[in-house]
Each structure stands twice: as C-alpha cells, then as structure tokens.
Design a protein with these regions (language model features):
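Short S/T/G/P-rich N-terminal loop/turn motif that feeds into the first structured element of a domain
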Residues: 1-55, 62-70, 81-158, 173-184, ...
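Generic transmembrane alpha-helix motif of multi-pass integral membrane proteins
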Residues: 57-59, 164
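Catalytic-core segment of enzymes that process non-peptidic bonds
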Residues: 74
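Alpha-helical membrane segments in multi-pass integral membrane proteins
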Residues: 155-156, 163-166
C-alpha cells in the first residue's frame, strides 16, 4: 500500500539549492516535492520568509519499504533520516495538482477526534502573488497561532510552488478553523480568503490533502512527539 511522508531537515545552503534544482529519484518514489522552509505569517521581506537552510520534503512512496530503503541507502535519504519526519496514510483530497491527480477524493473515513495532518500544495499564478500574500498572511498567522495545532509551517520552491503543513490535535479542530466555527474575529479569516480565491483564483493548480499520521521519527527544532 502506498504511503506519504513529510520531512524537515537542516542543510547547508549549497546542498539545499542542489536538492531544489535536482530532486531525488529512487525506486518506489512515486513523487517528491523539495521545498525551502518559510515561517507562517512572517513579513514578506524577512529571512524568516525564505529559510534556505531549512528543507521540507513531501513524498509519495510505493510502500513503507521503499521509504526505509531510501533513508538507509541514498546519501540524501540519510541526510533526511537525521531530521524529523512523519509517515502518513492518505484520507481525502480537495482540488487537483497534476502530479497527485490519481489520488481519490476520499480513501478513508476520519474520526473527528483523531489527530490529523493537512498538506496544501499550490502552483501560483505569478501576477496574483501580491493578492495571495495580502489575503494569505492573516490566515497563516491564524493557523500558526491556533491552540489546536502542534506544528504549522509553510514551504516554497521558487518561483511558483507554495505548500503548507500542519499537525492538528483533531480533525474537528481543523474543520472548525476551515469553516469559521472558531470563536472571535479570527474565525472569519479563512472563510473570507476562500471567498476571495473563488472570485479570482490565486493558483494555476491547488490541492488540500488530509492524512492520518502513522508514525513520527526524529526531532525538529529541539522538539519530538509533535504528533498528539
């Protein structure tokens, strides 16, 4: 059975740029996105906005054995193994990215009380980037500061690819944020941004993926046990 994984690692700038320009390939690796880290909600002109020493890698594998082999036998895989990663069971997809269009709209049921990992992936329309930043940054801060996220970050690959990754204590908490059921003024932020996106899309392609976390490995920024 295929699985997905999301990895975080620190790397020298030269190695990070090399991985962006030449993403890894391996037997059993169906798709990979190599991105540099961004802090959600950070100012546009800021070293926190594009963190070249922080790599994020999102991948789809034929099975868990293919991932284990890559982490043990490939130089880049061994570097990834020294960071943090979570192994993921795919549950649902909204929207479409060409490389992931084979994923069904729904592959499994979600218990509202179980921990959930959400990944978004977008190919930007470059003229729409200023609008995207204007409407997106408040939502970034909302997700980053939400009491029910244990980790929330963004990543990008110049010039068009943007991704977010968030770990939620429950599916109920995540959908409450998405549909504006949280209390107070922040509740409207995500809903209003979606209305603006529907008015004129920011993206050529966009997908939101929901996963069940299977296992967590390593540590990131001094933290482990990030999955509730």
């Amino acid at each position: 059975m295929s699985i997905h994984s999301f990895h975080l690692m620190q790397a020298p700038v030269r190695e990070a740029v090399g991985a962006l320009l030449r993403p890894p390939s391996a037997s059993g690796l169906h798709h990979v996105e190599v991105l540099v880290g961004m802090q959600l909600g950070a100012p546009v002109v800021s070293p926190r906005r594009m963190q070249l020493r922080h790599l994020a890698v999102f991948a789809e594998w034929a099975d868990e054995a293919a991932l284990d082999d890559f982490l043990a036998q490939r130089p880049f895989g061994r570097r990834l193994a020294g960071g943090w990663h979570v192994r993921l069971e795919f549950l649902r997809r909204w929207g479409t990215i060409r490389e992931l269009a084979h994923l069904p709209a729904e592959a499994g049921r979600t218990d509202p009380g179980e921990p959930i990992v959400a990944v978004t992936l977008a190919r930007m329309r470059l003229p729409e980037v200023p609008r995207f930043i204007r409407w997106g940054r408040p939502v970034e801060r909302q997700v980053r500061d939400h009491p029910e996220t244990t980790l929330a970050l963004a990543a990008m690959r110049p010039l068009r690819t943007v991704s977010t990754f968030s770990v939620w204590t429950s599916a109920r908490a995540m959908t409450g944020m998405v549909f504006g059921r949280d209390g107070g003024d922040p509740a409207r932020l995500h809903r209003e941004a979606m209305v603006e996106r529907d008015r004129r899309d920011f993206h050529h392609e966009f997908t939101t993926l929901r996963f069940r976390p299977l296992s967590e490995h390593g540590s990131w920024d001094g933290r482990s046990n990030i999955i509730p």
